[in-house]
């Protein structure tokens, strides 16, 4: 199941994402975050990725936000704001 989700995100990165200007406010990008979260936390990583996408909007500062070692739907507290 993990590989299906990861391949779906990679298809998005290759074929859909290049059609639009870069807009992710975080590093790593939201799609890369989703892949890393699924690799690290399995299916729960999908929830983490969706939560990340929902926090990626013009009213947030953005910056570094790597996938945390512990499952959480919040921004990584160790790497918080710049």
From Swiss-Prot:
UniProt subcellular location: Cell membrane
Any Pfam family hit: YidD
Major subcellular site: membrane
Keyword field: Cell membrane, Membrane
InterPro entries membership: Membr_insert_effic_factor_YidD
Domain of life of the source: Bacteria
GO CC annotation: plasma membrane
Entry membrane topology: Peripheral membrane protein
The family this protein is said to belong to: Belongs to the UPF0161 family.
Function summary: Could be involved in insertion of integral membrane proteins into the membrane.
Protein name: Putative membrane protein insertion efficiency factor
Species for this entry: Streptococcus uberis (strain ATCC BAA-854 / 0140J)
Phylogenetic classification of the source organism: Bacteria, Bacillati, Bacillota, Bacilli, Lactobacillales
């Amino acid at each position: 199941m993990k590989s299906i989700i990861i391949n779906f995100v990679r298809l998005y990165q290759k074929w859909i994402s290049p059609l639009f200007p870069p807009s992710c406010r975080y590093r790593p990008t939201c799609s890369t975050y989703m892949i890393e979260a699924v690799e690290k936390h399995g299916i729960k990583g999908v929830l983490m990725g969706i939560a990340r996408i929902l926090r990626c909007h013009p009213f947030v500062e953005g910056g570094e936000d790597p996938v945390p070692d512990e499952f959480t739907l919040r921004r990584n507290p160790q790497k918080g704001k710049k």
